[in-house]
From Swiss-Prot:
DNA-binding residues (ranges): 5-24
Database matches in Gene3D superfamilies: 3.40.50.2300, lambda repressor-like DNA-binding domains
Entry keyword annotation includes Metal-binding: no
Keywords: DNA-binding, Repressor, Transcription, Transcription regulation
Gene expressing this chain: endR
Taxonomy, superkingdom: Bacteria
UniProt KW Repressor keyword: yes
Name the record gives this protein: Probable HTH-type transcriptional regulator EndR
Annotated InterPro entries: Cro/C1-type_HTH, HTH_LacI, LacI/GalR-like_sensor, Lambda_DNA-bd_dom_sf, Peripla_BP_I
Organism: Paenibacillus polymyxa
GO molecular function list: DNA-binding transcription factor activity; transcription cis-regulatory region binding
Function: Putative repressor of the endoglucanase operon.
Boundaries of every HTH lacI-type domain copy: 1-58
Length: 340
């Protein structure tokens, strides 16, 4: 059931007119204490302002929003391009917002797009905004997740079979005689993004399947600006890994830059596999073994799901959501050395 302004006012202990003034950002005669009470009531009740709720019932704007994690990634760029191509077939325009995986920016962009009355959203989500997405589901707002999922939330999602992707990397390295395998990922933590946690899980499980102990020192995670130091830590170990898995295209670039700056050769000094088939991988010297994601198909499928949701006159929120897993493909090249 949709939360009303009256319920917010009652929770905050103020009048409806005061809540209305707050929503219109008219704070001239409003104390900080009152503002905090209203903010907390809105958060507790997952309230969507009436003016936004009304927009959900208005005519289509033929505009959708894409809340992207980072436009620096080739994978993300390809997904967004495919979304745009698919939407153009229906004369629907696309607005793209870049969050840099900042949950606060993500929340602001989602709220801004809804306030602008876009017909729906395709989102690269973070776990921190789960409560926001729960409220959107309750209010019947059309949206789809891509690349990541949020557990215990019924939302149509299109993403890679991430465990299968990292499993393919580890299997290929083991087949070439490697047991000391390092892996580098962006930040993990308790609320790790799906791609990161699942790829690490695939790495761990595959080593376990082959009775190879997991060396926690071979697992490095951090921000992009921390990569040179993290990569250096691997190579300065007493027993460094003979092979490294870069879990996305941006990390792969950082490993290649480190190797060049430190006069390390691939695959003689270390073997390398990257998840995401970057454009230069096939003609790099040596050509880099990669795992491809069907990025264009993922973008196309997520756009089609959203457009279908928008066209539906009634939403059945009790219906189970559809989780679509796309299969990765490994591209064997020349960056993995065969050990004796």
């Amino acid at each position: 059931m949709v939360t009303t302004m009256k319920e917010v006012a009652e929770r905050a202990g103020v009048s409806k007119s005061t809540v209305s003034q707050f929503l219109q950002k008219r704070y001239n005669y409003m104390s900080e204490n009152t503002k905090k009470k209203i903010e907390q009531a809105i958060e507790d009740l997952s309230y969507i302002p009436n003016e936004v709720a009304r927009s959900l019932k208005q005519k289509k704007t033929f505009i959708v929003g894409v809340i992207s994690s980072t436009i620096l990634s080739r994978f993300t760029t390809e997904v967004v391009r495919a979304i745009e191509d698919e939407c153009q077939l229906e004369n629907v325009q696309v607005i793209v917002c870049n969050t840099d995986d900042d949950s606060l920016k993500e929340k602001k962009y989602v709220q801004s797009m809804i306030a602008r009355q876009v017909d729906g959203l395709i989102i690269f989500p973070t776990e921190e905004n789960k409560k926001l997405y729960v409220s959107l589901v309750k209010n019947g707002y059309p949206f789809v997740f891509v690349d990541r999922k949020i557990d215990e939330l019924s939302v149509d999602t299109v993403l890679l079979n991430n465990e299968k992707a990292s499993r393919a990397c580890v299997e290929a390295l083991i087949e070439h005689g490697h047991n000391n395998i390092g892996i580098i990922t962006f930040p993990l933590g308790k609320k790790a993004i799906t791609t990161r946690s699942e790829r690490l899980s695939g790495y761990r499980n595959t080593l376990g399947k082959h009775d190879i102990p997991v060396n926690e020192n071979y697992i490095k995670s951090g921000r992009l600006d921390e990569m040179p130091n993290l990569i250096g830590q691997l190579f300065h170990m007493e027993n460094p890994p003979t092979a490294i898995i870069a879990t996305n295209d941006m990390i792969l670039e950082q490993v290649l830059i480190y190797a060049k700056n430190n006069h390390l050769t691939i695959p003689n000094d270390f073997s390398l596999i990257g998840i995401d088939d970057v454009s230069f991988a096939s003609f790099y010297n040596p050509p880099i073994t990669t795992v491809s994601q069907p990025s264009f198909e993922m973008g196309k499928r997520s756009a089609r799901l959203l457009l279908e949701k928008i066209d539906q006159k009634e939403q059945d929120h009790e219906e189970l959501s559809e989780i679509i897993r796309m299969n990765p493909v490994i591209n064997h090249r020349e960056s993995v050395l065969k050990l004796n």
